[in-house]
Amino acid sequence: MSRLEQRFAELKAEGRSALVTFVTAGDPGYDASLQILKGLPAAGADVIELGMPFTDPMADGVAIQLATLRALEAGQTLAKTLQMVREFRVDNHTTPIVLMGYYNPIHRFGVEKFVAEAKQAGVDGLIIVDLPPEHDAELATPAQAAGIDFIRLTTPTTDDARLPRVLERSSGFVYYVSVAGVTGAGSATTEHVTEAIARLRRHTDLPISVGFGIRTPEQAANIARLADGVVVGSALVDKIAQATSADQAVNDVLSLCSALAEGVRGARR
């Protein structure tokens, strides 16, 4: 059983949803980013998505584009992102880490080398937003062969004809993007999310995490009553953008994470 499978199974037994937090590796700088990463589990994050900075983040909204820019300007590379996971794993062997980003940096790094180093570092899953199922052989197949889950995005525009193809080789969990568009845009209604989850459950037994547009503990709680996981990214990244120092960035991100965790954990009581 993978770390992701284990975590979702534990939370299902507890009768609650997972808080899945997204931050960009290297934002606002390596040391502060590592502090945030190490602090998230104690602040209530059940699963961590760690963004791999890339110069052309086309699926991301302004908040995450700016986070990517800050990280790249601070010298973040894919090699440093993998090193960050290694350092995280020195003290934490239970919290799943999913790397999220685009295929280009991995392709340049070398797929075989990347998969081997990601596995060795302690990466549990990958979300590659610009690599559709038709290109499974390029990364999904070698990653899963190494024991790294490959997580697919589904959206309101993924119809019933397309869904089986998207979900066919998915593992870990399914990430439902509740609003069509870039990250951080709007938020979906409870009715919409309820219908979408019911539709996905007809096609897969994997846990379903819902993201995009969730910013407050109240919104997180609403989704936590419906989904197996609640993904929050832009709201956390905004705290880094608004901070006037690295220490403030760390404190503000972890404070918001704690508030979100409280919302998620109290949702089904």
From Swiss-Prot:
Keywords: Amino-acid biosynthesis, Aromatic amino acid biosynthesis, Lyase, Tryptophan biosynthesis. The active site is at 49 (proton acceptor), 60 (proton acceptor). It comes from the Bacteria. The alpha subunit is responsible for the aldol cleavage of indoleglycerol phosphate to indole and glyceraldehyde 3-phosphate. Pathway: Amino-acid biosynthesis; L-tryptophan biosynthesis; L-tryptophan from chorismate: step 5/5. GO terms for cellular component: cytosol. CDD domains: Tryptophan_synthase_alpha (cd04724). It is an enzyme of class 4 (lyase). Tetramer of two alpha and two beta chains. One of its GO terms (molecular function) is tryptophan synthase activity. Its EC number is 4.2.1.20. Belongs to the TrpA family. This is Tryptophan synthase alpha chain. Gene3D superfamilies: Aldolase class I. It catalyses: (1S,2R)-1-C-(indol-3-yl)glycerol 3-phosphate + L-serine = D-glyceraldehyde 3-phosphate + L-tryptophan + H2O.
